[in-house]
Amino acid sequence: GVHSGDATLVFPAQKIYFETARRIKKVSKMIAKELNISGPFNIQFLAKNNDVKVIECNLLASRSFPFVSKVLKRNFIETATRIMLDAPYTKPDKSAFDIDWIGVKASQFSFARLHKADPVLGVDMSSTGEVGCIGDDFNEALLSAMIAVGNRIPQKNVLVSSGAAKSKAELLEPCHMLAAKGYNIYGTAGTAKFLNENGISATAVCWPDEQGDLNIMDMFSKHVFELVVNIPKDHSKRELTNGYKIRRAAIDHNIPLITNARLASAFISAFCNMDEKDIQIKSWQEYK
């Protein structure tokens, strides 16, 4: 999995089952009551098919605390402090999450300064900063956040190395969107074969350790690609070596790199459905 500090956060949640959300609220109340918690606390949940499990509970305010405060326009630090001091406070309304805007928190990475480091995310936190952006809808908020941390919307050429079967299937619809928008899609052998078999024109490129006219490392040197989606597949020596070389080349040539299929899918869907020029410039106070 990916460390929660590196994950892209969407608030309020857009794709959680109603029953899952209900159970999360119920479990949170039970834990707070049983442990007699009066201040901020952080719970990490694992949810699948409405089955909710608690991974960990920490009696502290996470970095998402100020982000949530900004999105909901309520200073939860002040509220928590008042509760801990037994001072008067106003309870948040039950409809506090019913807002007409969405917040997205994206992580900032410094792999360009960490020479030879593998820019892939894992259980250890790698991000060195983050940004929070608000938009009228998910696409606007996500694009704003992704651009704010240094990503650029591609104009013509996208490289996709989609990894295992699950991530290939997850990236199929986004690749349909890219093709419909006129993008040139390049893929490693397995990905290109999968896309072509599913009606998407994709050009196969050679792995770094292969010889050919379309060697991927030569194409990086020529700055052919404007976005690289590289989903790690397995831990075989060849996959690890070639995958690392692709990811590192993207960073070294200052090309936006995404290594998570869900984030890649969301980002592609966002810029295919919304032009960068349509992103509104609004102050925080205008969201009301």
Show the residue positions of the predicted features.
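ATP-dependent carboxylate activation and anion-phosphoryl transfer catalytic cores
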Residues: 1-154
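A general structural motif
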Residues: 138-143, 162-166, 185-187, 206-217
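Glycine-rich phosphate/diphosphate-binding loops that line cofactor/substrate pockets in enzymes
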Residues: 147-158, 177-180, 219-225
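Active-site rim loops that border cofactor/substrate pockets in soluble metabolic enzymes
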Residues: 156, 192-220
